[in-house]
Design a protein with these regions (language model features):
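The conserved SAM/SAH-binding core of class I Rossmann-like methyltransferase domains
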Residues: 10, 33-34
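N-terminal Rossmann-fold NAD(P) dinucleotide-binding loop
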Residues: 16-17
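Glycine-rich flavin
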Residues: 2-5, 22-28, 34-137
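Beta1/beta-strand and adjacent pyrophosphate-binding region of the FAD-binding site
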Residues: 1-13
């Protein structure tokens, strides 16, 4: 069944999530498509700037002991980085849900100028249409 929206945003990065939330708060029916739930919030939050800077900060704090101590410290630092990215990812997701955006997991492909096909993780297909389609990848 074809789901109808005013706007469909493809990609959950900084610009896409911000625009989707703003449009939804203005009363538009908005869908945001992201192929991987582990990338909610985009590259910066999940694998770019923020986790990299967190690991650099932890490396600067690391005790200058033997390899075994440093190895354990590294393990803890990576776990803390994962906690941070998970918390940020969920905060971004919740902001969109609270704004009224429908978040859809899957890979988007254009079927025509106003229609998107979304293939889910288990091979399911959805068809979405909107007058405005925004690529944010």
């Amino acid at each position: 069944m074809d789901q109808k929206f005013d706007t469909i945003v493809i990609g959950f990065g900084k610009a896409g999530k911000t625009l989707a939330a703003k449009l939804a708060k203005q009363g538009e029916k908005v869908a945001l498509i992201e192929k991987d739930a582990r990338m909610y919030g985009g590259t910066c939050i999940n694998v770019g700037c923020i986790p990299s800077k967190r690991l650099v900060m932890e490396a600067e704090r690391a005790p200058a002991h033997d390899f075994e101590v440093q190895s354990e410290y590294y393990h803890v630092a990576v776990q803390e980085k994962k906690k941070l990215t998970t918390a940020l990812r969920m905060a971004n997701y919740n902001k969109l849900i609270d704004a009224g955006v429908q978040v859809i997991n899957g890979t988007a492909s254009f079927l025509d100028g106003k229609t998107i096909g979304v293939k889910g993780a288990h091979g399911t297909m959805q068809t979405l249409s909107a007058s405005k389609l925004i690529i944010n990848t």
